[in-house]
Amino acid sequence: MASHAAAKAPSRRRVHTRNRLLAAAYEVFAAEGFGRATVEKVCERAGFTRGAFYSNFTSLDELFLAMWEQRSAELLTDVRAALDEISVDGVTDVRAAVDGLLRAVPLDDAWFRITAEFTAHALRTPALRRVMAAREEAIVAALMPTVVAALARAGRTVADPVALGQALVAVHDGTAAQVLMEPDNAAVHRRRAELFCHVVLAYSTPNGG
């Protein structure tokens, strides 16, 4: 038993180290920007050596992608939980479902800044751009079955889940900056919710319709 536990200990330590580095990187990226971040700054914030960093990640790019996957998994969990809790019954309740979902998954100012900077960095790096595009497609593909199921409970059918997913991402990305710039502006929040509703209704049809 003791030897079995000892064999597992390094794996647990590695997971702990990796999570500490991810948390430290989030703080460094948010405070200084991705472009100004360095491996040394991340290690200093985490309390680890460069060796600990390079035993887990090959670069800051790889670290960011791991962070993105981690936060995407958390987002998927939150969205699924929110949609499962929302009772929808017909078209008139789609807005209520959207409002509930937006409340359950609020925007993160720091994360928006981090992803905006990294996206600009990726656009200058073709290989990285392809990786980001593929991972975003995977995230949307993982999310859409939950969205489609929620709409089915509302009596609506989605003919093209991929198109709906891309449209929802576009609305999210396009309105996030407005909401974060004017967090207390009720009209901005209302328009964001209305745009989500318009997209959902445009890319779905009533059952039997």
Spans of model-derived segments:
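Hydrophobic/aromatic-rich alpha-helical bundle segments in the mid-to-C-terminal region
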Residues: 129-133, 150-209
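Basic, helix-initiating cap at the start of DNA-binding domains
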Residues: 1-32, 36-48, 62
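Helix-loop "lid/cap" segments that line or gate small-molecule binding pockets
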Residues: 99-106, 113-124, 200
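Amphipathic alpha-helical packing segments from all-alpha helical-bundle domains
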Residues: 76, 107-116, 126-152, 194
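Short hydrophobic/aromatic patch on the recognition helix
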Residues: 46-57
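Hydrophobic alpha-helical connector segments
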Residues: 66, 79-111, 158-168
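Amphipathic, non-transmembrane alpha-helical scaffold segments
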Residues: 14, 68, 72, 129-140, ...
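Alpha-helical DNA-contacting segments of helix-turn-helix folds
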Residues: 57, 64-71
